[in-house]
Curated annotation (Swiss-Prot):
This is Carboxy-S-adenosyl-L-methionine synthase. Pfam families: Methyltransf_25. One of its GO terms (biological process) is cellular response to iron ion. It comes from Helicobacter pylori (strain ATCC 700392 / 26695) (Campylobacter pylori). Homodimer.
Length: 243
C-alpha cells in the first residue's frame, strides 16, 4: 500500500501505529536509500559468520535477534542467505507491525515474534543481533544501556548490525546532506508538504548521531572492531564484532 500518511499534517508525534504499519514497507523503500541492498549486505555478513560456526555450542542452532523488527523484512533476507537451521526472534513494541511480520513469514517455521519493549528483555546468548534504523528512535540516555545488554548477550565472535540515519558534525555539510536527502525523497514521489509534515512529526522522536558518535558508542560498550559496511550521504550500515 502506498504511503500517503503525510499528505496533511498529523498534528501529533510519529508513532508506529496501525496506519503506519499498513504503509510501512512502502515508506521504508521510498525513505531509506538502498534499503534492500543494506538488508542483503547485513544478511550476508551474518551468514558468513555462521559458516565459520560462530555460535554458542550450547545451542542446538544459531539464535539471531532482530530488535525493532517491524514487518520482518530482515528475516526474509536472512532466510534467503542462510542455508542452515537457525532460530529467529523478532522483538517490537508495535502489535500492528508484528501482525504484518507474522503474515509475511507464515511460510517459515524458524521465526517467532514477541511484542515487548526490547529495553526490558533478558536476551539469551545469541550469534547475532540487528538494530536496523531503530537505535535512532531510542532515547539517547538509554542507547548505551541497550548496547551493553546486547554486547553481554552476544557469543564470542558474534556480530551486531546497526543501520542508522546519521548527521554530520559540520553544520554546513549536515545542511547539504539533508537537502540532498530531501531531493532523493522528492524523486521517490514525496511532495514538499509530505516531507515537511513528516519532518515535523519526527522532531524529537528520531534523534540521529554522527557516524563518529555511533562508532564511539559501540566501542564504549566493549566492541573492538566496528566497520562501516555501507554509507550513502546520511545513512549507514555498521557491523560490530565481539572478540
Amino acid at each position: 500500500m502506498k504511503d500517503t500518511l503525510f499528505n496533511e499534517s498529523l498534528n501529533k508525534r510519529f508513532c508506529f501505529d496501525e496506519k503506519v504499519a499498513h504503509v510501512f514497507d512502502d515508506m521504508l523503500e521510498r525513505s531509506i536509500p538502498y534499503y534492500h541492498e543494506m538488508l542483503n549486505l547485513g544478511a550476508y555478513f551474518i551468514a558468513q559468520n555462521l559458516k565459520e560456526n560462530i555460535y554458542p555450542k550450547s545451542l542446538p542452532k544459531p539464535l539471531i535477534y532482530d530488535l525493532g523488527c517491524s514487518t520482518g523484512n530482515f528475516f526474509i533476507a536472512l532466510n534467503r542467505q542462510i542455508q542452515q537451521e537457525i532460530e529467529l526472534v523478532g522483538i517490537d513494541n508495535s502489535m500492528p507491525m508484528l501482525k504484518k511480520a507474522q503474515e509475511k513469514l507464515k511460510d517459515f517455521n524458524n521465526a517467532r515474534f514477541e511484542c515487548m519493549d526490547f529495553l526490558e528483555v533478558e536476551f539469551k546468548e545469541a550469534s547475532a543481533f540487528s538494530l536496523l534504523f531503530v537505535l535512532q528512535f531510542v532515547r539517547p540516555m538509554q542507547r548505551e544501556v541497550l548496547l551493553k545488554k546486547i554486547y553481554n548477550s552476544l557469543a564470542l565472535n558474534g556480530v551486531l548490525l546497526v543501520g542508522e540515519k546519521i548527521m554530520s558534525e559540520d553544520r554546513i555539510l549536515d545542511k547539504q546532506m539533508i537537502e540532498l536527502y530531501y531531493l532523493y525523497k522528492q524523486n521517490q514521489g514525496y511532495s514538499h508538504n509530505e516531507i515537511a509534515f513528516k519532518r515535523e512529526a519526527l522532531e524529537n522522536v528520531l534523534v540521529p548521531y554522527s557516524l563518529k558518535e555511533n562508532v564511539a558508542l559501540l566501542e564504549s560498550v566493549g566492541f573492538k572492531h566496528v566497520e562501516a559496511l555501507f554509507k550513502w550521504v546520511n545513512f549507514t550500515l555498521l557491523v560490530a564484532r565481539k572478540t
